[in-house]
Amino acid sequence: MNWIERIINKNIVLTTKKMHVPEGIWTKCSGCVQLLYTKELERNLQVCPKCDFHMKISARSRLLAFLDQGSVCELGQELLPKDIFKFKDRKKYKDRLIDAQKKTQEKEALIVMQGTIYSMQVVVAAFEFDFIGGSMSSAVGSRFVQAVNQSLKLKCPFVCFSSSGGARMQEAFVSLMQMAKTSAALAVLYDRCLPYISVLTNPTMGGVSASLGMLGDINIAEPKALIGFAGPRVIEQTVREKLPLGFQRSEFLLEKGVIDLIVRRPDMRLKIANLLSKLTQQSFSEK
């Protein structure tokens, strides 16, 4: 044994015990695959500080971060999903609802709140993608209409964050009717000259993108969000052509004039506040 080995052996303590690291301390980025400290990721609204990849964020977390603290009042909690057709595929619809409610701790795929943003009154809604793909049911449509009505009542702007796969197939034509219902409600908002800002997040597809998602006075998207009606694979199979790189991503849509802005999630609150102050002719302080 040489002198280095003697020093090392004296200072190293061997143990057979495994170190216990609590679950949830680290999160792997879906973009760069780096391990991130979960608390830091949460502070950055689920945006990777290394590669700026926008990871999934819950609807409730999004809204609570968007509105001023202490100003929040939730709306539409009494509007719940119903198994109108006793639908069953591989699983009963009512069982899917129970599973989704347990998974997300939410009663439906749309959460509506009223409050203030930099002291400006606003009504805001957000889709919860983990609740059956953020799909639009009759209850989601009713919650959305209630949000619009509250905006009309308060004479304030309305903001909606979309993240959805489209209409909820388990409710058949009733879910498709929500496209017309929500669009008609937004037409009233437009007639009253009240601003509606639509924020399209990853993904916003199907009936949601074809109705309320694209009807904003200003349509904003998060970076690299997938936005469209049918998915790219379905389109490729239909037209039998290879689609352009980045097709249906927010950057592609901005280039084609489909959306107005791309805004990073950490910058969204201030950007929307600036837009609302101009649209409503209100001043606000960033402090």
Swiss-Prot record:
Pathway: Lipid metabolism; malonyl-CoA biosynthesis; malonyl-CoA from acetyl-CoA: step 1/1
Known cofactor(s): Zn(2+)
Encoding gene per record: accD
Protein name: Acetyl-coenzyme A carboxylase carboxyl transferase subunit beta
Free-text cofactor note: Binds 1 zinc ion per subunit.
Subcellular locations according to the entry: Cytoplasm
Functional summary from the UniProt entry: Component of the acetyl coenzyme A carboxylase (ACC) complex. Biotin carboxylase (BC) catalyzes the carboxylation of biotin on its carrier protein (BCCP) and then the CO(2) group is transferred by the transcarboxylase to acetyl-CoA to form malonyl-CoA.
Zinc finger (C4-type): 29-51
Biological process according to GO: fatty acid biosynthetic process; malonyl-CoA biosynthetic process
